[in-house]
C-alpha cells in the first residue's frame, strides 16, 4: 500500500510542471534596445520572473514607443515600453499605463563642433525621431532659448538614421539620447551637448512607462496583474543591483556593457515600494499631468485625459 501511495505521489508530481505551464498566460511584450528600455525585460528573462508569475512572454524589440502603440492598436502586441516623448499616446486614450519604469535624464540636444548655444541652431538642420523624448527635449530647449520649431529645419528620422546622419555631417544637430550619443561620440569626438533633461528638472519630470493594450486590460485583467508583478520584482532587483543589471541587459542585447553604463547613470531607478508611495501621494499623476500640459503646448494634444483614466494606479498599488 505504501508503495502504491508513493507511486501515486510520484506521478502527481511528474505532472505538476505541465499543469503550471498550462496555466501560464501568453503575452507579447515590446522593448526598446537600450538600458532603460530593455533592463526590466532582460532581468525578467534572466531571473525566470515570467514563469514565476505565470506568464509565457514573447519579447519583441522596437525602435521607439509610438511604433509599439501602433502595434498595441493593431492587436499584435499586449504590453510595451515607452519613453517620455510618447506619453501623449496613452494620454489620448490609445493605451493604458500599467507601471512607471524610471525617471530619465538620458536625452540631449547635441550639435556639431563649433555650436555654442541653442540660438546658434537657427536655420540649421536638426534630426529627431518624431514623438520621442528627444523630440520633446528639443522643443523645450528651443522654447527656453526663445525659439520655435519654425526657426530650425526639423528633419524626422529614426534613431539609427540620426546616428549615421550626424556622423556624416548631413545634419547640424539632433534631439537624441544615450547610448546612441555614445556611439556618435566615437565618430564625432568634438560634438557638443546643448541641452539635457536635467536642465528642466524638477519642474519637468521625464518618466518612462510600461503600457498595455486597452483590450487586454478590459478582457484579461489577470494578465495585467501578473505583468505588474513581474515589473515590480524586476524593478526592485534593478535598483538593488545596478551593476549586475547592466551586465544582464548587455547579455540580453548582445552588446558591450560599456555602451549601456553611461545611459544607466543618466536615469533614476525606483523600487516598487517607492513607486507605490509616489502613486498613492499623487506624484505620478502629477508627472503625467505635467507631461500632458507640455504636449498641449507643443500641439500634440488638445484635450488630454486625466491620468486616473489611463494610469492603472489601483492595479499597481494593490498588494
Curated annotation (Swiss-Prot):
Domain of life: Bacteria
Keyword presence, Cytoplasm: no
Subcellular location: Periplasm
Molecular function as annotated in GO: ATPase-coupled transmembrane transporter activity
Secretion signal, residue range per the UniProt entry: 1-22
Keywords from the UniProt entry: Periplasm, Signal, Transport
Cellular component terms per the entry's GO annotation: membrane; periplasmic space
Keyword Phosphoprotein: no
Principal place of residence: periplasm
InterPro entries hit by this protein: ABC_SsuA_sub-bd, Solute-binding_3/MltF_N, SsuA/THI5
PANTHER family from the UniProt entry: ALIPHATIC SULFONATES-BINDING PROTEIN-RELATED, TAURINE-BINDING PERIPLASMIC PROTEIN
Subunit description: The complex is composed of two ATP-binding proteins (BAB2_1147), two transmembrane proteins (BAB2_1148) and a solute-binding protein (BAB2_1146).
Family recorded in the similarity comment: Belongs to the bacterial solute-binding protein SsuA/TauA family.
Protein role: Probably part of an ABC transporter complex.
Protein name: Putative binding protein BAB2_1146
Amino acid at each position: 500500500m505504501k508503495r502504491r501511495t508513493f507511486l501515486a505521489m510520484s506521478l502527481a508530481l511528474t505532472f505538476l510542471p505541465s499543469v503550471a505551464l498550462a496555466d501560464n498566460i501568453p503575452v507579447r511584450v515590446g522593448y526598446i534596445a537600450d538600458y532603460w528600455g530593455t533592463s526590466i525585460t532582460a532581468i525578467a528573462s534572466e531571473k525566470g520572473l515570467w514563469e514565476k508569475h505565470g506568464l509565457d512572454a514573447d519579447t519583441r524589440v522596437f525602435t521607439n514607443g509610438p511604433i509599439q502603440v501602433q502595434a498595441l492598436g493593431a492587436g499584435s502586441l499586449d504590453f510595451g515600453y515607452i519613453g517620455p516623448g510618447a506619453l501623449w499616446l496613452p494620454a489620448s486614450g490609445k493605451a493604458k499605463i500599467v507601471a512607471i519604469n524610471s525617471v530619465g535624464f538620458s536625452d540631449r540636444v547635441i550639435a556639431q563642433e563649433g555650436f555654442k548655444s541653442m540660438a546658434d541652431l537657427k536655420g540649421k538642420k536638426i534630426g529627431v525621431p518624431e514623438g520621442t523624448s528627444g523630440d520633446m527635449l528639443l522643443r523645450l530647449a528651443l522654447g527656453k532659448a526663445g525659439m520655435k520649431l519654425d526657426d530650425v529645419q526639423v528633419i524626422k528620422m529614426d534613431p539609427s538614421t540620426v546616428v549615421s546622419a550626424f556622423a556624416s555631417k548631413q545634419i547640424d544637430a539632433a534631439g537624441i539620447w544615450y547610448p546612441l550619443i555614445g556611439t556618435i561620440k566615437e565618430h564625432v569626438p568634438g560634438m557638443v551637448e546643448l541641452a539635457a533633461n536635467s536642465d528642466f528638472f524638477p519642474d519637468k519630470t521625464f518618466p518612462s512607462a510600461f503600457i498595455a493594450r486597452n483590450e487586454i486590460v478590459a478582457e484579461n485583467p489577470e494578465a495585467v496583474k501578473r505583468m505588474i508583478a513581474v515589473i515590480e520584482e524586476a524593478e526592485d532587483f534593478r535598483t538593488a543591483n545596478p551593476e549586475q543589471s547592466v551586465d544582464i541587459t548587455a547579455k540580453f542585447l548582445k552588446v558591450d556593457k560599456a555602451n549601456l553604463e553611461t545611459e544607466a547613470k543618466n536615469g533614476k531607478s525606483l523600487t516598487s515600494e517607492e513607486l507605490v508611495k509616489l502613486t498613492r501621494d499623487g506624484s505620478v499623476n502629477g508627472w503625467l499631468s505635467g507631461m500632458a500640459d507640455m504636449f498641449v503646448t507643443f500641439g500634440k494634444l488638445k484635450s488630454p485625459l486625466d491620468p486616473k483614466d489611463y494610469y492603472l494606479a489601483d492595479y499597481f498599488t494593490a498588494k
